[in-house]
């Protein structure tokens, strides 16, 4: 008998700012075992130019992957490896920091609403000192599934299975298997998604409200889900949500600012390497 995933806990996003004053809603899970392999979800949402125009000036990372997904907006990525990429409405970009990267994400847009997400994904110890990587995914490369009763699925990373159909997104190079899906639906539409039972899973609602089984999740809340082989969602009203699933990493997590390693000694080494200018040479 198929075991349905249910809500273990609902976590509200907390308002804060990052970069040069960009307004965000944040859910951090650095020390939550059922959050792994994910570390943090930031919802970037601002109606006023003043709340995003400063962007994210050059800053370092080591030991993580970042996946940025834009619902509405236009930003540019630059890094010390020479990569330049544009992130447009409906598109995504992924970066594996490995042993070190310095990058910026700055707005090209001069007006209009900003709405998107940045997800931090942990790198397993074996990858934390690997060369950095970068990929961008234009809106047309995001794989979509439209269904009149089940709404719209946009698969950004990994694979998802619905009614024996497997849909694979453009990002498949994460250090451990991970899936990120945007599900949008009108009131009354529902969907059942098969989920790998060994994956952790969580669902963030960014618009409207929906039910996981018989439990409701409202805008701005993350539902941490129990283990199971199937996830059933039903839209209470027009809604948008982000489903994150991934293989947990059973390793120590030590977080300091933009660095995530396995020990404090490794964090201290990252700080020394950055201060010595080594990141610029990677």
From Swiss-Prot:
Annotated Pfam families: Pirin, Pirin_C
Cofactor: a divalent metal cation
Entry keywords, A to Z: Dioxygenase, Metal-binding, Oxidoreductase
Catalysis performed (reactions): quercetin + O2 = 2-(3,4-dihydroxybenzoyloxy)-4,6-dihydroxybenzoate + CO
One Gene Ontology MF term: quercetin 2,3-dioxygenase activity
Free-text cofactor note: Binds 1 divalent metal cation.
Span list, region Disordered: 1-21
Entry's EC annotation: 1.13.11.24
Metal-binding found in the keyword field: yes
Residues reported to bind a divalent metal cation: 59, 61, 103, 105
Keyword field contains Metal-binding: yes
Coiled coil location: none
Pathway membership: Flavonoid metabolism; quercetin degradation
Top EC group: oxidoreductase
Superkingdom per UniProt: Bacteria
Family label: Belongs to the pirin family.
UniProt function note: Putative quercetin 2,3-dioxygenase.
Record-given protein name: Putative quercetin 2,3-dioxygenase VC_A0969
Lineage: Bacteria, Pseudomonadati, Pseudomonadota, Gammaproteobacteria, Vibrionales
């Amino acid at each position: 008998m198929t075991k349905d995933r249910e809500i273990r806990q609902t976590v509200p996003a907390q308002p804060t700012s990052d970069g040069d004053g960009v307004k965000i809603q944040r859910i951090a899970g650095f020390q939550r075992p059922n959050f792994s392999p994910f570390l943090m979800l930031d919802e970037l949402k601002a109606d006023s130019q003043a709340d995003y125009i400063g962007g994210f000036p050059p800053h370092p990372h080591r030991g993580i992957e970042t996946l940025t997904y834009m619902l509405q907006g236009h930003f540019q990525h630059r890094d010390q490896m020479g990569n330049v990429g544009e992130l447009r409405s409906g598109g995504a970009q992924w970066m594996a920091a490995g042993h070190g990267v310095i990058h910026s994400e700055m707005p090209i847009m001069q007006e209009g609403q900003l709405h998107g997400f940045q997800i931090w994904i942990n790198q397993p110890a074996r990858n934390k000192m690997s060369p950095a990587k970068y990929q961008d995914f234009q809106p047309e490369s995001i794989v979509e599934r439209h269904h009149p009763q089940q709404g719209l699925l946009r698969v950004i990373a990994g694979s998802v299975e619905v009614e024996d159909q497997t849909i694979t997104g453009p990002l498949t190079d994460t250090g451990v298997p991970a899936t990120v899906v945007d599900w949008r639906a009108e009131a009354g539409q529902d969907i059942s998604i098969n989920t790998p039972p060994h994956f952790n899973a969580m669902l963030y609602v960014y618009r409207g409200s929906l039910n996981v089984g018989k439990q409701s999740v409202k805008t701005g809340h993350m539902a941490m889900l129990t283990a199971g082989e199937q996830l059933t969602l039903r839209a209470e009203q027009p809604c948008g949500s982000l489903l994150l699933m991934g293989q947990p990493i059973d390793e120590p997590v030590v977080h300091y600012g933009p660095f995530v390693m396995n020990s404090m000694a490794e964090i201290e080494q990252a700080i020394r390497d950055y201060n010595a200018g080594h990141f610029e040479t990677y």
